Regions:
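A conserved ligand/cofactor-binding region detector
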Residues: 1-824
């Protein structure tokens, strides 16, 4: 329903006025990018009214607030999503058409805000969407990165990282809020004194460098309920203006020192930490946004509440992974050094306010900091962590007298390292995993000692995705079809999709469903032709793997299987082979050389396969450059097959698997993460599962016995595929892929051969791929499988996940902004 403020004539007039006001141009003279800005400011004007109404309701109703703290928020484009949530998309599209403008072209002008990279950031974005839609009060807390992680270019098959300058034209949906700026301190030292009245030590942090954290707010709209929450991202500015006096005297270095300190903190997401300076910068980033966010939260609480001891009644901090876990010590610092609480009081408050989400089973991803770095950069924070550690070790000794192995495994500070996950578990009142299997592995393997000591803290919250972004916005053809058949309630209650099952044997419905899939494939094929120069057949099977490039996600297994299929087709050209298009999209971290080499291999295989006339275009390989939310929406809608092939026990949950499922793509995957729960919902007959179980993998890792060389020696086809990596088939430089070849077969001091069991799962994967082909050839059977994946995806909404967080962890109250739009 069109918001009353979106009268078409008023809207058109406002767009023209904004073009004139912003650019001194008429609509006819303006560029498409300028028109995007003008349209966005028109929409923002309406959003701000709702934002103000929401703030008024929050102030009057005084609800408990969740501060969702995350290094990443991968929001995606805002214009179209905001229009859908306002209920004004169709009317605005018509208004723009009357001005001679195409809403799709205008939406394409918007840069993806470069505030995240992978699933961690996209989950945070989905959660904010659900919190607003479900009428809860929330703040997202993060960093306003000027250049994101990087913009990926592919040159000669290699990933090239260039700055993602998403702010170069200004971003219309953010608002600078300098009046809420906070000071953050680094370095210096702590002077310990004595308070004779309180008869206790005092701690005074002196000699520090300061940075000003300046907030920028982005509105997070609920769907059709007028609730607007806030994503608050912090930019860094120097405390003092540029030192012109120093500059005039020739001391340029001193003059720009403050400027550089601030700028470096917010320049990029995840600076390369292969070296000391990179590690220091990452720790600075984490403390910077955590300190600013906590200062703001405590200040906000104190405006309306007198008793700081009751902070947990109104505030909860959810730490998304280990990056924000320094929040534990920072909250203690604020409560003791600024609010005057004693240790026991501060601990009582902190341990009721902070909760931790674990996102990884892989121990190397659980952050640790060198004591030397941590204590130098954050001396007061380190002191507090030392004391938390001392008291915790006393607890462990009481529970397990004389068990020094327990202390070694559980200590927060040990062997010159500060272990952030341990800090979060010890201090937090809740520790959650993000899929049922993941949580069980945490409890029984990785965090077993902590689970035995604090079983009441551990719980599972299986991840989810927002259907409003990944179906309503990303696949409007399918969304409209679903609404025509079961009504619109699924938009805010995804379990309603189960009503579609009555159409699972309806030939007309299935044909319409597959026609929509084909139209989405045509749209993606057009994008691939425009961006890759590769012509792909929308009648072929679109087999898609899009996610961060990491060895455990096994893009290498996928491309080795493509080589295997290519060899088979070359050997048996007469074979009845159903055409396949293998689509990859992934960024590799700038310092992750193996991952970057896998990207090069994918592109080298594509060069050979796509240009071999003897296979008649039956296999195509495409690597989509600069994978991000805006092209992801198009990819999910077009996929036939969802590749979820990580090594079992390594993927905490995954959410791409849910997005593919929602859009009607059956999964080929291992029984890991949320794949397990997807198969439970849709049935094994509607998925293609393969590979070793997580128990088998964990057993091999603990006890040995896995030998990839044995597989290499007895399986001639696998051996041929690997030899082709080093015999010039895919590069005239026979050493180019030698390190990938060696990683699969050669055990080194630091790493065993084939760490992620690629050869061990290869045959099982190839067999599953054969089952995919056989199923797809039977189009009636495939249509039903694909359709049931959509119909059975109701569990995987982030709305369901958020309600579980609210019930079990956060204990929030719903806020009513528009009484006619209150959700139960």
């Amino acid at each position: 329903m069109l918001d009353k403020q979106f009268k078409k004539e008023t809207f058109k007039k406002s767009v023209k006025e904004n073009v004139k006001f912003l650019y001194r141009k008429t609509l006819e003279e303006a560029t498409q990018e300028q028109i995007f800005q003008a349209v966005s400011y028109t929409v923002k004007d309406v959003i701000i009214d709702h934002w103000l109404e929401s703030q008024k309701a929050f102030n009057e109703q005084d609800p408990k607030i969740v501060y969702y703290m995350s290094m990443e928020f991968l929001m995606g484009r805002a214009l179209g999503n905001n229009l859908l949530n306002l209920g004004a998309y169709d009317e605005v599209r018509e208004a723009l058409e009357e001005l001679g403008l195409d809403i799709n072209v205008i939406e394409d002008q918007e840069p993806d805000p470069a505030l995240g990279n992978g699933g961690l950031g996209r989950l945070a974005a989905c959660f904010l969407d659900s919190l607003s839609t479900l009428n809860y009060c929330a703040y997202g807390c993060g960093i306003r990165y000027h250049y994101g992680m990087f913009k990926q270019k592919i040159k000669d098959g290699y990933q090239i990282e260039v700055p993602d300058n998403w702010l170069k034209n200004g971003y219309p949906f953010e608002m600078k809020r300098p009046e809420y700026a906070k000071e953050v301190h680094f370095g210096g030292h702590v002077e310990v004194g004595w308070d004779p009245v309180k008869r206790e030590n005092t701690f005074n942090h002196v000699g520090y460098q300061s940075v000003l954290a300046v907030p920028y707010d982005m509105p997070i709209l609920g769907y059709d309920n007028k609730v607007v929450n806030t994503l608050r991202i912090w930019d860094a500015e120097p405390i003092v203006d540029f030192g012109l006096d120093s500059f005039d005297k020739g001391d340029y270095k001193k003059a720009v020192e403050q400027e550089n300190l601030a700028r470096n903190i917010v320049e990029v997401l995840y600076p390369n930490d292969n070296h000391y300076a990179g590690k220091e910068l990452r720790l600075k980033q984490q403390y910077f946004f955590v300190s600013a966010s906590l200062q703001e939260a405590v200040e906000k609480y104190k405006k309306n509440h007198d008793d700081i001891m009751k902070l947990s009644d109104k505030v909860v901090f959810q730490m998304n992974d280990t990056h924000p876990t320094v929040a534990v010590a920072e909250l203690m610092r604020i409560l003791m050094d600024q609010e005057g609480l004693g240790w026991d009081q501060a601990w009582a408050v902190t341990s009721k306010c902070v909760a931790y989400t674990n996102h990884t089973i892989m121990s190397e991803a659980l952050e640790k900091w060198p004591v030397e770095l941590f204590s130098r950069l954050l001396p007061r924070i380190y002191q507090i962590i030392e004391e938390i550690n001392r008291r915790f070790i006393e607890q462990v000794q009481q529970k397990y007298p004389g068990n020094y192995e327990k202390i070694r495994k559980m200590a927060i500070i040990y062997d010159g390292q500060v272990k952030m996950a341990h800090l979060a578990i010890v201090a937090g009142f809740s520790v959650n995993g993000v899929a049922r299997l993941h949580t069980e592995i945490l409890k029984n393997q990785e965090l077993k000692d902590f689970y035995e000591m604090f079983p009441e803290k551990f719980n599972n919250k299986t991840n989810g995705i927002t259907q409003r972004r990944f179906l309503l916005h990303g696949n409007q053809l399918l969304a409209n079809w679903i609404t025509e058949h079961i009504g619109p309630d699924w938009i805010t209650d995804l379990s309603q999709l189960n009503k579609l099952t009555v159409y699972a044997d309806d030939e007309k419905a299935l044909q319409e469903f597959m026609n929509i899939k084909f139209r989405n494939k045509q749209r993606l094929a057009k994008y691939i032709l425009e961006h890759n120069g590769v012509e792909v057949d929308p009648h072929s099977i679109f087999d898609v793997q899009v996610k961060r490039l990491h060895e455990y996600k096994r893009q290498l297994l996928n491309i080795l299987h493509v080589i295997y299929l290519y060899n088979d087709l070359k050997m048996h050209p007469e074979k009845d082979f159903y055409p396949r298009t293998f689509i990859f999209g992934a960024k590799a971290s700038a310092g992750y050389h193996t991952a970057k080499k896998i990207i090069k291999l994918i592109n080298s295989v594509a060069d050979v396969v796509n240009n071999d006339p003897s296979i008649q275009g039956k296999i195509k390989v495409v690597f989509i450059e600069n994978y991000r939310v805006s092209n992801a929406e198009m990819i999910f809608a077009a996929a036939d097959v969802s590749e979820q092939i990580c090594t079992a026990s390594k993927e905490a949950s995954g959410t791409g698997n849910m997005k593919f499922m929602l859009n009607g793509a059956p999964t080929i995957g291992t029984m890991d993460g949320a794949n397990v729960e997807i198969v439970e919902e849709v049935g094994e007959e509607n998925a293609f599962m393969f590979g070793m179980s997580s128990d088998q993998i964990i057993n091999y890792e603990r006890n040995g016995g896995y030998d990839p060389n044995f597989i290499y020696n007895i399986d001639t086809e696998i051996r041929q595929v690997l030899i082709q990596l080093i015999n010039g088939t895919f590069s005239s430089d026979t050493e180019l892929f030698r390190d990938l070849y060696d990683s699969l077969l050669t055990t080194k001091v630091s790493d065993r051969a084939d760490r992620y069991f690629i050869l061990g799962d290869f045959r099982s994967y190839a067999d599953a791929q054969k089952r995919v082909e056989e199923a797809y050839k039977d189009q009636k059977r495939w249509a039903k499988m694909a359709f049931l994946n959509t119909a059975k995806s109701g569990k995987f909404s982030s709305d369901r996940t958020i309600e579980e967080y609210v019930k079990d962890i956060w204990h929030l109250d719903k806020v009513i902004v528009d009484k006619s739009k209150t959700r139960k």
